Amino acid sequence: MFGSFGVLIALMMFKNQHPLNAQLLFVWTLMEAYTVGVVCASYTAAGQGRIVVEALVLTASIFAVLTAYTFQSKRDWSFMEAGLMSSLWLLIFWGLFSWFVPSLAGGLYSLFGALVFSGFIIFDTWQITERFGYDDHILASITLYLDILNLFLYILQFLSRDRH
């Protein structure tokens, strides 16, 4: 996890230096895939493999619908930025606090996380089409990848809340 974060920082620093940026994106993607693979394998080993598939289908469906809506709407979604960033900080602090108080409304936390990253999918898709330049493909990949990945993990957490 910390290695992945380190590669992500390096990726952000060298986002415009080709081919290093593509190589770092490849390494970071492999590290994230391994991490998510371990999470999914642990659910499967616990007899909850069906939940992983349900979370995958829900994530893909939500992403497709929100992306289509964002492209179709032609709205300026910049007003969402402050609220999404505030919500992200709330999720971070809530997650840290829940380490000390584990029963702190886990279902509500995961549902809120899924809603926040659904909002990020709309905002970042709009940002890619309206704010990002032609050379920002690495940054665009990272933002949507993180949105989809986090949405999947929060949905997975929400679906498994009563099945532990």
Each language-model region and where it sits:
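A hydrophobic alpha-helical transmembrane-helix feature that marks the membrane cores
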Residues: 1-164
